[in-house]
Design a protein with these regions (language model features):
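PLP-dependent amino-acid enzyme catalytic core
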Residues: 1-249
Length: 249
């Protein structure tokens, strides 16, 4: 691996940071992580278990990118984008592929949208191997950049990061956006209250722990239950990086 000696770096609010740090730890590759300063302690500690090279930045995309570039240049690190990277997108596609291999008759898959890597991979898997399955994206109403991007035909940015779904605060990228444009059928929006209500329902009824960024898909399904009644639907809820005690239902 070309960067095994020098190391790698990414910016992430938690999930990709955790995954990359764990992989780098197993492969004995130096790993540096840039995280927003408002990242909760639970996520910080999860990453800290695998790397001590954690740097804080302001909670906006510009700060994440500039901080990452500065550290990468200083330490000669290889940058791996958390969502706008083809290898990452293809890696994400295996989630939907496994789901569709088990349930090949699904008519829809709902996927969260943050930086766009997960839903881009999800849509590639579905449309290449299970063409009859439609992909629905979901994002918080407060950070609806993907929804606006598809409407305008160009990558839009968020004016705020004010959502409990902290993993969905980032913007789309030049690699995943064309994939989303071509293969994602529709993007649905949900409110903060709808996200919290769905999160509570998942924890209480399904007895599984997910983070708010994952709960958006159930929130969208409940909000549009009449439209999707009697349809076979898969929900991708792949993030469980959350401190339950920090949530206010």
């Amino acid at each position: 691996i070309k960067f095994k000696k020098t190391g790698i770096i990414t910016h992430s609010s938690g999930n990709f940071a955790h995954a990359l740090a764990k992989a780098a730890y197993d492969l004995k590759i130096p790993c540096y992580i840039v995280m927003p300063s408002d990242t909760d302690n639970f996520k910080k500690h999860s990453v800290y278990a695998y790397t001590k090279n954690i740097f804080m930045c302001d909670s906006n995309l510009l700060s994440r990118e500039t901080t990452t570039k500065t550290i990468a240049k200083k330490n000669n690190l290889y940058f791996i984008h958390p969502s706008n990277n083809l290898d990452v997108i293809l890696g994400n596609s295996t989630c939907a592929l496994e789901l569709l291999n088990d349930y090949s008759d699904l008519q829809y898959i709902f996927s969260p949208i943050g930086g766009g890597g997960l839903i881009a991979g999800t849509s590639l898997a579905a449309k290449n191997f299970f063409k009859s399955c439609n992909i629905i994206g979901v994002e918080p109403q407060n950070v609806d950049d993907a929804y606006r991007s598809v409407k305008s035909g160009k990558i839009e940015t968020n004016l705020t990061t004010n959502t409990i779904a902290d993993g969905l605060r980032t913007n789309l990228g030049s690699i995943n956006f064309p994939i989303i444009q071509e293969f994602v059928e529709e993007i649905l929006l949900v409110t903060e209250n709808e996200i919290l209500s769905s999160l509570k329902l998942i924890i209480e009824k399904l007895k599984i722990v997910v983070e708010p960024s994952s709960a958006v898909v159930l929130a969208a399904l409940i909000k549009n239950k009449k439209r999707f009644r009697n349809k076979k639907i898969g929900l991708i809820m792949c993030g469980g990086n959350v401190d339950i005690q920090s949530l206010k239902f």
